[in-house]
Amino acid sequence: LPICPSGSVNCQVSLGELFDRAVKLSHYIHFLSSEMFNEFDERYAQGRGFITKAVNGCHTASLTTPEDKEQAQQIHHEDLLNLVLGVLRSWNDPLLHLVTEVQRIKEAPDTILWKAVEIEEQNKRLLEGMEKIIGRVQPGDTGNEVYSRWSGLPSLQLADEDSRLFAFYNLLHCGRRDSHKIDNYLKLLKCRLIHDSNC
């Protein structure tokens, strides 16, 4: 259900409810991302040594994200909200292409395809929710347009199967990592803005 039908005047969804929905969504996205990565890893990455190559190769690396809760605590909530928005926007493009390209993987199970489609849709919903939250917390500010461009499509289409599978592996690895970060930042923001840091 849409949070507020467009054009509705008396739509009173509290900021707390908006955060509840965002946290539930981000948790679901992280759960799906982990499941999809594990399934892909089990099916395609065994014995290929991908994990040793997959260090720091995420397209969102240019967005400086706090490494742990302590670092995140130091960041002003407006900056943290904008950071979440930036990471989500950075995934629009890769998720769209992931849905298309995953269908071309040899014997790709339906479960992986379903998760890719579901994550792409839920990411859009979370992005809309975050824009609403930012509109409430910082009225008149839709957040900055900062996001990380993704240029990984050619690597998902490589003829060499090993290289192509590694590109998928890396993308799914990054998706799991970033969805985990977003999940943590949103929980922290909810605690700070809704519960006055008493959690």
Swiss-Prot record:
The keyword Secreted applies. One of its GO terms (cellular component) is extracellular space. It comes from Crocodylus novaeguineae (Crocodile). GO terms for biological process: positive regulation of cell population proliferation; positive regulation of receptor signaling pathway via JAK-STAT; response to nutrient levels. Keywords: Disulfide bond, Hormone, Secreted. It is found in: Secreted. This is Prolactin-2. Disulfide bonds join 4-11, 58-174, 191-199.
